[in-house]
Amino acid sequence: MKTKKILSTLLMTALTSVSINAQHQFTINTKPGATIQPTMYGIFFEDINFAADGGLYAEMIENRSFEFPDRLMGWNTFGNVIVNDQKPAFARNPHYITLSDAGHREKRTGLENRGFFGMGLKKGMCYDFSVYARLHMLQGDSAKFRVELVDEEDRPIVSTRITVKSNQWQKYTSTLTVDKTVEKGLLRIFLEKGGAVDLDHVSLFPEDSWHGMRADLVKDLAELHPGIFRFPGGCIVEGTDLATRYQWKNTVGPVEERPLNENRWNYTFPHRLFPNYYQTLGMGFFEFFLLSEKIGAEPLPVLSCGLACQYQNDDNDRNAHTAMADLQPYIDDALDLIEFANGPVTSKWGRVRADMGHPAPFNLKQIGIGNEQWGPLYPERLEAFMKQIRAKYPHIKICGSSGPSASGKEFDYGWQQMRKLGVDLVDEHYYMSPDWFLNNAGRYDHYNRKGPKVFAGEYAAHVRGLDKQPNVAMNNFEAALSEAAFMTGLERNADVVWQATYAPLFAHVEGWQWRPDLIWFDNLQSVRTVNWYVQMLYATNRGTNVLRLTEGGKPVEGKEKIYASAVYDKAEKAYIVKIVNVDDREKQVNVTFEGLKTLGKGKCITLHSDNPRAVNALENKTNVVPQTSEIEANGNVVSVKVPAKSFVVYRF
């Protein structure tokens, strides 16, 4: 007992000492204020950086249906291999290959595929192989081919044989279990015996994939606890031209019948060209809706408004922008999507959803029309969408766009038009320097509270280069800390800011076109960036209501390099305070909770690094991660030392 009393006295002395010498005196009004939307913190998916094919979509075969413009791109062939399209297995993907005898007993016919930057194979993992096959032109009674998985030294590590006896297309499957981990393997197929054989839709998935998605990447998303999931883009919604825009109806139904689409990111950046980057659409709208359910996020699909990318096309280009008189098919796509998501199984598109295995509706509540659109071309088209959507589905919220910039003439015009049209939310985008984020923590303090709410749909801090280097745009601690500081302003203004999503989401370490990105991966593993941990800490400590936190009667938004916000969680009956110290010195802070008598014990979660350029990487995943400790209040006052360069969450 005497020891406990001594420790208690020491603790009280320490708290009193901090209290007396505190540099900052924060006051929190504990009366719950504005409601924080469940959608406040979320994720945005776009197929950039090989985020879908070669990433979240777990298919390991590149160009599995031989539909790339170069039909054999991704494949190495040997012997007698030709591409055919006579009497195909799938009308919308008509090309397939024919393997015929090599013409000599010592020669072989076959082909091999290295997947996306090599095939990552895990020891003990089972891989599900499938292919559609038939005897070619009734040549022989049967044909046999061997399927192998091969390591970096060109040694087969597992194989299987498949015998084809029919001249009708049939699906053949086999499971391959590997006994070693391989970073860059390949799949090889040999024709072994008999006449010619036709093959199509050659596929390989890891057994632990979930609805065709990589298990580890799904887990990375689920553990963010996002409230909103925006998909499928982004610029791919628009397309470089209308022919390459994202068309959701091409992404539902059997994957074998989903037509190929060109990915606009395969040629956008001359220094990062990927001519083999296409969209097989195996990761389609049905899968996006399923993933939304899986991770507990509200879906937000975004559709083309009839304008191709305005960066890449002139406003008067009739080939790039649909005329108003021809807009109805685009509007029908939006109406049909809502029916696909929410309609009864007796409806046309509700039946498609049910036939895919989900008779229950997806409970879609909002839809985005257009991506980064600006100027007069956009609002007149958006208005046409809004009239018909609201007439048929008045409960669906509509998200418009303020364009690609955080301010300026086009931004102001966009907001003016969005208010005039009466959209529910306005999508703002800003990829800016850490200084911009630090200087804009009060961005939304003076926004008009009437009219549309804010959706910060794409944002990320792009780090300055060192010395004379260009912007390096890495996911380092400096960027993450500035985002954490800025997000105190999002939280404080939750009455007008309803949702926010960092962008982009995924990047393959060998296949990226854009950085920074929230989650990096190779073919075997992934890494959660420091920015990921900032997003996770906000999402898991979102709360239900804003609490007014002030110092000297004013919001804490960067004076003396400190930022803060506070929320209350009704379900957990918890008070949560977030403090960001971007200074090089520790800050001593008193936080007084007005209206409370005592807080008791709580926990402190700290994200800190002494090195602003510190990163989490595949070879060092936990370089910068949150650390948790206990804390105790003195009555209704919490006295803390906030470490230099840190983001701290206090929860009582």
Regions found by a protein language model. Name each.
Residues 43, 131, 225, 292, ...:
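Conserved, mostly hydrophobic/aromatic
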Residues 387-388, 394-397, 415-418, 424-541, ...:
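Catalytic-core region of carbohydrate-active enzymes that cleave or remodel glycosidic bonds
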Residues 191-192, 232-235, 305, 310, ...:
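Active-site groove signature of glycoside hydrolases
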Residues 574-581:
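Short, well-ordered beta-strand segments enriched in hydrophobic/aromatic residues
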Residues 23-280, 298-300, 313-328, 371, ...:
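Extracellular and organelle-lumenal recognition/adhesion modules and their flexible linkers in secreted
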Residues 176-179, 185-186, 206-226, 281-291, ...:
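An active-site-proximal structural segment forming one wall of the substrate-binding cleft
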